[in-house]
């Protein structure tokens, strides 16, 4: 079972020492557990994923319009960035180069530095780069996604205000889209809930707040990650409510919705679910 609103950002989390969102899927032996989940007789499992939803929301929220347009046109953003890295056209056949592009797009949007990027490339993609190359990748990402960098800075200012709200300051929108409102209480989300940072204060190494796990360090890039995850969770949650009008979702795995359907109605169910998940939310109608 999943725990509703188990994470700080509102995402579901595991419970009873099991997290169905993180079942192994690559290792042949370990993925046997995932493969053991079967539908009833004469039924099928339908898994529909909102592709790259957090990466899409990030550039949309930042107002990085050129990158938003790539998603809107259905372009491969991993290949696009890899083409910039290698100064030549990269496509899906160039698996190693595309993997570098993918790791950068998914890993550098929240302020990751060159040391961590170097480790992630080796761990997730089996690609080793030296320190100079890792620094170049980080620099290139930030040049291409300059509005994302500005969003980190904007969130740093939001932390400062939330920690000590100026007497003459009115609530204000964070990022583009007018879906996030910075208030003394925290950051108000489109569904009316808040991302909060209890007892937020400026420490010797930056801002920090209290949580059930202890004292947590926080900065603009991490705030961006928080709000992007929260917005993605709202998108999926609203889609599940609409899907539930005709078909019952049985599981959500981060950005995916899982339903069970009879074999006879599988295509109709799939078309219905995909239609809903291809529709932008009312509070972000221009989200690709």
List each model region and its residues.
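Acidic, glycine-rich two-metal-ion catalytic cores of nucleic acid-processing enzymes
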Residues: 1-92, 154-256, 263-264, 270-277
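Short, hydrophobic/amphipathic alpha-helical patches that form generic packing surfaces
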Residues: 55-60, 103-110, 143, 226
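Catalytic palm subdomain of template-directed nucleic-acid polymerases
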Residues: 58, 116-129, 141-146, 257-274
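Core structural elements
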Residues: 81, 85, 100-116
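Short, surface-exposed acidic
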Residues: 86-98, 125-138, 285
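Alpha-helical scaffolds flanking conserved acidic
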Residues: 94-104, 247-248
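Polymerase palm active-site segment centered on the conserved acidic dipeptide of motif C
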Residues: 133-164, 264-288
């Amino acid at each position: 079972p999943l725990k509703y609103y188990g994470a700080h950002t509102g995402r579901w989390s595991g419970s009873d020492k099991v997290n169905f969102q993180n079942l192994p899927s690559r290792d042949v032996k370990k993925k046997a557990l995932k493969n053991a989940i079967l539908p009833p007789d004469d039924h099928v499992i339908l898994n529909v994923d909102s592709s790259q939803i957090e990466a899409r929301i990030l550039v949309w929220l930042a107002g990085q319009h050129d990158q938003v347009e790539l998603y809107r046109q259905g372009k491969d953003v991993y290949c696009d960035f890899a083409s910039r890295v290698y100064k030549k056209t990269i496509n899906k056949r160039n698996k190693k180069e595309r993997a570098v592009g993918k790791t950068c797009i998914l890993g550098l949007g929240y302020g990751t530095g060159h040391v961590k990027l170097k480790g992630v490339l080796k761990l997730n993609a089996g690609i080793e780069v030296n320190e100079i190359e890792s620094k170049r990748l980080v620099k290139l990402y930030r040049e291409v996604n300059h509005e994302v960098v500005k969003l980190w800075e904007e969130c740093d200012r939001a932390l400062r205000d939330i920690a000590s709200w100026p007497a003459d300051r009115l609530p204000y929108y964070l990022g583009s889209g007018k879906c996030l409102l910075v208030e003394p209480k925290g950051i108000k989300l489109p569904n009316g809930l808040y991302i909060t940072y209890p007892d937020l204060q400026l420490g010797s190494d930056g801002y920090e707040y209290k949580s059930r796990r202890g004292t947590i360090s926080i900065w603009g890039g991490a705030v961006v990650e928080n709000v992007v995850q929260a917005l993605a969770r709202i998108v999926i949650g609203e889609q599940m409510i609409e899907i539930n009008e005709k078909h019952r979702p049985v599981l959500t795995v981060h950005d995916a919705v899982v339903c069970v359907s009879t074999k006879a109605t599988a295509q109709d169910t799939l078309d219905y679910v995909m239609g809903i998940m291809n529709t932008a939310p009312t509070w972000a109608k221009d989200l690709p």
